Amino acid sequence: MQVLHVCSELFPLLKTGGLADVVGALPAAQIAAGDDTRVLLPAFPDLKKGITQIQVVAQLQTFAGYVELHFGHFNGVGIYLIDAPGLYDRPGSPYHDESQYAYSDNYLRFALLGWVSCELACGLDPWWRPEVVHAHDWHAGLSCAYLAARGRPAKSVFTVHNLAYQGLFNARHMEQIQLPHSFFDVYGMEFHGQISYLKAGLFYADHVTAVSPTYAREITQPEFGYGMEGLLKQRLLEGRLSGILNGVDPAIWNPAHDLLLAARYNRDVLDAKRENKRQLQIAMGLKIDEKAPIFAVVSRLTKQKGLDLVLEALPGLLEQGGQLVVLGAGDAELQQGFLAAAAENPGQVGVQIGYHEAFSHRIMGGADVILVPSRFEPCGLTQLYALKYGTLPLVRRTGGLADTVNDCSLENLADGIASGFSFEDSNAWSLLRAIRRSFVLWSRPSLWRYVQRQAMGMDFSWQVAAVAYRDLYQRLL
């Protein structure tokens, strides 16, 4: 089966969020399972540097100007790059400039991405043509619209990684991006008078997936639907919306082979985790005390991630003898709040503003509990990494967090499926109650080890996701 993923990021070459991790791992897992899978991306500078042995597949004039389509390989996966320097060769992130302003021509930059994916489905590369075009998030949403406009030369799947980002643009651009004017309709890609690239994907895709079963249900409700809940509820009733969990790449996230750790360990030999904890306490200026549980945050510092609740609950956490480590960047108010907490509680709170992939591994290896109290979480990767490292996740029961973490209730402990802690209501009191329960388990080291081993034995591999996507593709074909 020939599958083309369409997206804007690829780990480890270019990453602004979890989307890059997904596209960096899923195609390789699909290839290992026997599918002929390739990826299409804009030729952003970091991607051009990392893709080797480039060949020119096509040269063409488009509504966005002159474009070359290049082909190369990365980590055994075939990669198409859309080389249009005037659109993609810029400093800053793929989406905004160094002053954090969205590029004014994003409508054109990502329309071109969708258009080229459709051209590949129509035979632009004479040596390879996809049977399924799998588009990811709003950046690739127009793939589904162009395919619909061209008579659906390939089946289309659209995956929602985060419904909050919708790709909204002025209606006057419809003519320039060369889609039928009839598509600008409430039964199409119109959303409150604007073009929505996200809605284009949701409306025109043959099938929509979310990155967890619970999130697929949540986005049919007003609380999580961002105005798309009506369309998504219809897709659910039609059998055209489902949830498939993301996975973990064991080549990157495996404590038994992770060279970024001070000491390697596995679920059968956990003692070396103590050395990672000691090194983390040293690195973050915490009191060296193996009896004090380290709670960690590795996240964008935003209210969506529930990190204002962590600040509210922090006094209670520290009173019980816990320590807190924070790695992340985001809202200025939250950054200042955590920095102030570190200044007020030396030896108990350590904060590093910014994101460092290597240091996130050290935190996973050294912390005891990872905090993920998100108000909503489509899938979440942090808790999956934590499970692999025996760092018990403490999560709010929403989205993918609900699908991947089993609370340490008496029933789950008895059934041998407990893997962390969860709470329902999005407030500091509920979070603090879950923290208190984690201290109860911490006071029983043998039981804590038992739950660690349960967590580390859970299978959230990309092989499982690859099989689920293959089953979906086959149903469409």
UniProtKB/Swiss-Prot annotation:
Q: Name one GO molecular function term.
A: alpha-1,4-glucan glucosyltransferase (ADP-glucose donor) activity
The pathway where this protein functions is: Glycan biosynthesis; glycogen biosynthesis
Reactions catalysed, as given in the entry: [(1->4)-alpha-D-glucosyl](n) + ADP-alpha-D-glucose = [(1->4)-alpha-D-glucosyl](n+1) + ADP + H(+)
What are the UniProt keywords, alphabetically? Answer: Glycogen biosynthesis, Glycosyltransferase, Transferase
A single GO cellular-component term from the record reads:
cytosol
Recorded hits in InterPro entries, A to Z, give: Glyco_trans_1, GS/SS, Starch_synth_cat_dom
Q: So where does ADP-alpha-D-glucose get bound? A: K15
Read off the Pfam families from this record: Glyco_transf_5, Glycos_transf_1
* GO BP term, pick one: glycogen biosynthetic process
What is the enzyme's class at the highest EC level?
Answer: transferase
Q: What is its EC number?
A: 2.4.1.21
Give the signal sequence positions: none
State the superkingdom.
Bacteria
* UniProt KW Lyase keyword: no
Task: Read off the Gene3D superfamilies from this record.
Answer: Glycogen Phosphorylase B (3.40.50.2000)
In the record, the note on similarity to other proteins reads: Belongs to the glycosyltransferase 1 family. Bacterial/plant glycogen synthase subfamily.
Q: Which PANTHER family match?
A: ALPHA AMYLASE DOMAIN-CONTAINING PROTEIN, GRANULE-BOUND STARCH SYNTHASE 1, CHLOROPLASTIC/AMYLOPLASTIC
What job does this protein perform?
Answer: Synthesizes alpha-1,4-glucan chains using ADP-glucose.
Q: What is this protein called?
A: Glycogen synthase
Protein's organism:
Erwinia tasmaniensis (strain DSM 17950 / CFBP 7177 / CIP 109463 / NCPPB 4357 / Et1/99)
Annotated gene: glgA
